[in-house]
């Protein structure tokens, strides 16, 4: 009896771990930081804790839903990649229908929380990001186009905008800058992953830039996107949304990141190692900027580009 109980307990723990795995906790955590950064930037010190918690929890559930359904969609290509071949949607440890229903359920819950506690604009951005990621990127672009990364970068840039618009209820220049910043950041971040995971992507025939058009072009794009990201990031302090601390942090991190990227042109460069360094510092950069914008906010009055009434 005790042995059977222990076995059942072990099975339940494994099943729970599998459900957590399909939500991609690392992605959720990264998005939590950016949502909080956008929210606190807009709040300017006047923080509604209930609204902030609802924004964080609601969007986390929406992101988790998108990741779970992405696992269902990608199960065939995941089986061909060393990094993903042991996912529960590939091994069958959890039935595909269960993962799909789980993804739908937490998505409905997440959107429900956003609808109840935030506003129409924040909800709209969350919905657009979800549709782009699940419907456009996962179902078609990832498998069929070298521009899949570009399309996916939009959905990756939505979380801080949702956090920002949860507070303001309007689309102003601050929201536009955040959308551009985080979209641009996604590109070198994703291309770096594609380089050090080159064999996986090639095996699954996913047309990411390094596989479809070569390493040299991918390196050019990484350097270009980092340079443009650096310029766009300075727009937050230049437009008066953040102060000198944010300007100092964005200049320092962007310059270091760009210098690191330029090392990829060395003849003796170890490409996978270099790409991992670029990837690792991309996370440091965006985390530092998210934290700094949350703390170094400035009072600025902006005319909304548009507003949605609840």
Curated annotation (Swiss-Prot):
Gene3D superfamilies: UbiA prenyltransferase. It is a multi-pass membrane protein. The chain crosses the membrane at residues 25-45, 49-69, 98-118, 121-141, 145-165, 176-196, 222-242, 245-265, 277-297. Its EC number is 2.5.1.141. GO terms for biological process: heme O biosynthetic process. It is found in: Cell inner membrane. Pathway: Porphyrin-containing compound metabolism; heme O biosynthesis; heme O from protoheme: step 1/1. This is Protoheme IX farnesyltransferase 2.
